[in-house]
Amino acid sequence: MTELDNFSMLEASKQVPDRKESSQILADHMSGRLLQKRLELVEDLWETVVRSECPLEQVERLLRLKQLSNSSGIVGEEQTNQINEIVELIKEMDLAEAISAARAFSLYFQLVNILEQRIEEDSYLESISRGQEEKINTSIDPFAPPLASQTAPATFSELFDRLRRLNVPPGQLEELLREMDIRLVFTAHPTEIVRHTVRHKQRRVASLLQQLQSDEVFSLSERDNLRLQLEEEIRLWWRTDELHQFKPTVLDEVDYALHYFQQVLFDAMPQLRRRICSALSQSYPDIDVPQEAFCTFGSWVGSDRDGNPSVTPEITWRTACYQRKLMLDRYMHSVQELRNQLSISMQWSQVSTQLLESLEMDRVRFPHIYEERAARYRLEPYRLKLSYTLERLKFTQQRNQELSEAGWATTIERTNVSNNPDEDLHYCSIDEFRRDLELIRNSLVATNLSCEQLDTLLTQVHIFAFSLASLDIRQESTRHSEAIDELTRYLNLPKSYIEMTEDEKVIWLMDELQTLRPLIPSAVQWSKSTEETFAVFRMLDRLQKEFGSRICRSYVISMSHTVSDLLEVLLLAKEYGLVDISSESSDLLVIPLFETVEDLQHAPSVMEELFQSEIYLKLLPRVGEKSQPLQELMLGYSDSNKDSGFLSSNWEIHQAQIALQNLASSHGVALRLFHGRGGSVGRGGGPAYQAILAQPSGTLKGRIKITEQGEVLASKYSLPELALYNLETVTTAVLQNSLVTNQWDATPSWNELMTRLAVRSRQHYRALVHDNPDLVAFFQEVTPIEEISKLQISSRPARRKTGAKDLSSLRAIPWVFGWTQSRFLLPSWFGVGTALEEELKSDPDHIELLRMLNQRWPFFRMLISKVEMTLSKVDLEVAYHYMTSLGSHENREAFNCIFEIISNEYKLTRRLVLEITGKPKLLSADPALQLSVDLRNRTIVPLGFLQVALLCRLRDQNRQPPMSETLLTEGDIGRTYSRSELLRGALLTINGIAAGMRNTG
């Protein structure tokens, strides 16, 4: 029997439609209608503000532009006429009006973004309510599709109910919950393009919109007042500069990222725990969620120094101190609140002996607190204990401030010591603080009392500790090899490090790792680069000694290629006290980042050699009840995509995961895979739930680490319910993937088919991107890549090498950003159509097989879904306008050839995706998403034409000799203006298009 016969039997057996799937379809339709309804209010507000802020003539042109862009579905001559009218309207604008138009459309898209976030939040709350009702009213459906094939996000309640109905044993679920380790790592790049000041105004607008559009009953005057407040807030927003005037410092980026912890996540995480506990009690009442955190956070902001010279050891030190300060401030506030609440008197309640004994020790340690508070709290032991706790937190904050001000290189003597010189007044570790809180909790429980506020604080302590988020150090591999090479030259070895073969390097590094004598001499004047490399390790040692290893234990090596890349870092860590060979311990987790396709293919052989080393295995940390050595590996989506295209990159990562997991299991090593996913599809982005379910079965085992890029933080974590939705989505996906085996992953013929598709896709992609000699010029001229580099949104340079213009030096983020702005979105789909077509040419019947893969294999469905979504955002009419307007005359013929290649591939990919999905239009299976994308596609058109007009004039100016910066205010956009004003206009259009497309790079 063939696979297709099996598929037909499976389809025939589905007598009953899946209720969850039906409910999701209904919810999607409702979300679409809700968007249309609420959009009327937003558009009315937008038009009201624009009319009040712009001259009448400008308003009429602006509204006409929007009207023209809203005309969907027209083709042929009428479409050409529409585009011509848009171009003519833009030509009538002077620069001031063009800037106003760009700002107006940008404002519109950001209002729509706020609206959609609120609808997502409402839909999440509705799904929780709907899921509870369906659970009560729904009988077991034996014909429901396999759980591993469900890609609509599930709530905890829905997931646990389905697991119970699938007879997943309680013991298996309980073991997974104990082992579960989800880590979300915030990064600064690609940076959020919206200013922090503007974000604040957006939150205010979102709050007012929520009130105005809620079901709450308001009087007519109250509604009018809300409406006036909204108009006023949007007008204030309109008069606020959207552009960053200065390049942000690294500490600015730190402050921005930590904002989400302060405003949302600190309070959301205890709610997440309560939700999982509540849902678990309904389906698996005998299972308790472990107190240990199953989801924690990391950060690269302030510690990722790969290609960013602004991230120095001092910056990382100050970042750690700042994070600690925020946590201590929150804990002090919470302890004060608890002290107000726990007014329990010993006259009416017993207190544990352990608590009373601790009060006596505190009296000796803090006599001044005893003198101040003992009389007031004589019969209120909990308040007295919390007063001592608060005092220790204050001393901890004082110590943290001293360390921050002194810097990492200055040793600060212990000043906060009690009468006992071996006893610190401040908390030396989070465990000491947690023990004090648990002492209070245990005493309350012993007397049949509970305190939700205390439980909330304990949950926060387990998740955030004093560090808030663990800092990952990241550095490029050549920085370590160059530093060690300089060292070997100084030591005058027979061969310098760079001159050694890979085998010689490994032997020498292993020997030095086991040698107790120091290798790096002190008081040597190293080069600036080498000195900074060594200083990072010295700073890390100091940081861990002061704050504990949790603050900064992971060291990510970007562009990892070989075994020596990892051993170099271990050797440097050993030299500065982070690794102790004699005790077989390491305070540093060395994480290779495999980024290119070639490195992904070689990753298993690299790790095989390391796992065969007893020394290496002994230095890995231990996890779980079996105390297995843990190896973390990072997989790079961005550079592998830029290197070989979307389909090839995703398949190589998929294959690498399977090979690495099999290898780790054979050596008794636990594996945690770190996914370096970006915000855009071209850098591994897309729906998290779908992406996690698409991971190969058996590779997660409850452990996953994922980057959360700067550009998506606002869309995921700006509102409490949005944050909870994202966190619940990730958690349920990890549980689902880990517990329910997806049988389709192990189908050999499917893997062979995917390998063929990946090879063909890679060949076609590389033929254009790497082998076509005109592609670099096309990208430089036809996209706003040079202007993007002038946006003051990131502390990191756009290129790895200053002055280089080749693609290899260009980072993946601006690579994707440029293609997105010009509406090609090429990195996210190019090569897929050709691969599919060549497969079907070899066997036309494989179209049925591809349809089956799309229905039954989460990985393949994820690929097709991402390509479909990306194709829906491509606009070749706009892209063609970029090419014809911005491309130089001498390159016209070559550029036309490139555009024809892209256009043909787009049409081919679109046709075959629709054949595979069986849908008449892109996104027709998701009405809400289709409506949102269609709305943005139409309304964004004028911004693209505005951008082209401004770029044409700006680039003409740049080709002229320097001239006066005086702005001529009369005339159309084609007249003479200063470079700075033209650049400002162009940057505003970049902001607006980024808001409309909802991502940068």
Swiss-Prot record:
Role of this protein: Forms oxaloacetate, a four-carbon dicarboxylic acid source for the tricarboxylic acid cycle.
GO MF entries: magnesium ion binding; phosphoenolpyruvate carboxylase activity
Disulphide connectivity of cysteines: none
InterPro entries (alphabetical): PEP_COase, PEP_COase_bac/pln-type, PEP_COase_Lys_AS, PEPCASE_His_AS, Pyrv/PenolPyrv_kinase-like_dom
Domain of life: Bacteria
Pfam family, one: PEPcase
Family assignment from sequence similarity: Belongs to the PEPCase type 1 family.
GO biological process, one term: oxaloacetate metabolic process
One term under GO cellular component: cytosol
PROSITE patterns attached to this UniProt entry: PEPCASE_1, PEPCASE_2
EC number: 4.1.1.31
Protein name stated in the entry: Phosphoenolpyruvate carboxylase
Cofactor: Mg(2+)
Record has Magnesium as a keyword: yes
Catalytic residues (positions): 189, 642
Entries under NCBIfam families matching the protein: PRK00009.1 (NF000584)
Keyword Repeat: no
Catalytic activity from the UniProt record: oxaloacetate + phosphate = phosphoenolpyruvate + hydrogencarbonate
Top EC category: lyase
This protein's UniProt keywords: Carbon dioxide fixation, Lyase, Magnesium
